[in-house]
């Protein structure tokens, strides 16, 4: 299987590469594609070292040529950030002037990101369709995932969007219940960030009432939503629902704090310095602060099932 990653120069890419390496011989070729040549070379070389650490027989290459990179691909992952972190910081700040939440996937900021991103993703997808293998899948990681993936589907692309909210809940619930995550089956209502967990089945038995009874403060704290809201709902909302349930509080907090984009930009600069170390061959702990917990696990499971 050839996997092409569009936006492969992201500092997050090594998280994906680590997951792809664990797919074993299923992945024969991994191509990272990005217009930022210097950054791509750093991430690409580090990705090669990750594959070697696992003893993976597949090749890892990189290119700034989108058309060449996606040619013959079985799966194309799209993880773009049009405008980079500078645009993200704008998305997280301009809504505050209107008394609205500033966030890259929700509200006015999310809509602005979608308007910038969808045309670019559709162009990329058209080029993938023209050059990838017949029947190739597009896997979208690009936020806002719901809007971007819907645009891909409406344009007739064979695409699926991936979000880490569900797998994050699965892992958290499994830890609290002290069971293997694979045994937890969620009743996951909603799409992408606008979601609620209505049940958590283990061996056919819904254990969510038990979780709410025994771990309500912990669950509420994890999603930053008042415990009384969870108790009233009888389910666990995505932490993104905090922007709706606690809108005014979030706006006040955002006005007094650095944006998430500013923090991510700082983390990215440090990560790139770390990736340049030729002795580094495993993802650093700092990558966990970049965001996207469990994305590689979700991606591995999804791509293996395609």
Question: What residue ranges belong to the model's regions?
Answer:
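Short acidic low-complexity segments
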Residues: 59-72
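Conserved glycine-rich cofactor-binding loop
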Residues: 9
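NAD(P)-binding Rossmann-fold cofactor-contacting core
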Residues: 26-50
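Rossmann-fold NAD(P)-binding glycine/threonine-rich loop
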Residues: 86-154
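Rossmann-fold dinucleotide-binding core
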Residues: 14, 137-204
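Short glycine-/small-residue-rich Rossmann-like dinucleotide-binding loops
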Residues: 74, 81-82, 143
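Long, compositionally biased stretches enriched for glycine and/or charged residues
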Residues: 175-306
């Amino acid at each position: 299987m050839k996997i092409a990653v569009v936006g492969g120069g992201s500092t997050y890419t090594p998280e994906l590469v680590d997951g792809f390496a664990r797919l074993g011989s299923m992945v024969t070729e991994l191509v990272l594609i990005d217009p930022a040549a210097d950054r791509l070379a750093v991430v690409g070389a580090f990705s090669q070292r990750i594959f070697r650490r696992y003893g993976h027989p597949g090749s890892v290459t990189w290119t700034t040529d989108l058309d060449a990179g996606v040619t013959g691909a079985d799966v194309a992952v799209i993880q773009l950030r049009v405008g980079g972190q500078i645009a993200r910081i704008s998305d997280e700040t301009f809504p505050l002037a209107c008394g609205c939440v500033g966030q890259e996937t929700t509200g006015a900021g999310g809509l602005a990101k979608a308007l910038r991103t969808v045309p670019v993703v559709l162009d990329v997808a058209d080029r993938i369709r023209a050059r990838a293998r017949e029947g190739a899948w597009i896997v979208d990681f690009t936020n806002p995932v719901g809007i971007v993936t819907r645009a891909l589907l409406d344009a007739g692309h064979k695409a699926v969007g991936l979000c880490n909210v569900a797998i994050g809940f699965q892992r958290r619930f499994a830890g609290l219940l002290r069971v293997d995550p694979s045994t937890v089956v969620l009743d996951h209502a909603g799409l992408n960030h606008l979601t609620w967990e209505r049940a958590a089945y283990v061996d056919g038995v819904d254990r969510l009432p038990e979780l709410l009874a025994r771990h309500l403060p912990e669950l509420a704290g994890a999603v930053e939503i008042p415990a009384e809201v969870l108790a009233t709902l009888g389910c666990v909302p995505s932490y993104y629902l905090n922007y709706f349930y606690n809108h005014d509080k979030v706006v006040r907090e955002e006005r007094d704090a650095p944006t998430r984009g500013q923090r991510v930009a700082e983390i990215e600069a440090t990560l790139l310095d770390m990736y340049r170390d030729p002795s580094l061959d495993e993802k650093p702990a700092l990558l966990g602060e970049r965001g996207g917990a469990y994305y590689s696990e979700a991606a591995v499971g999804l791509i293996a099932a395609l």
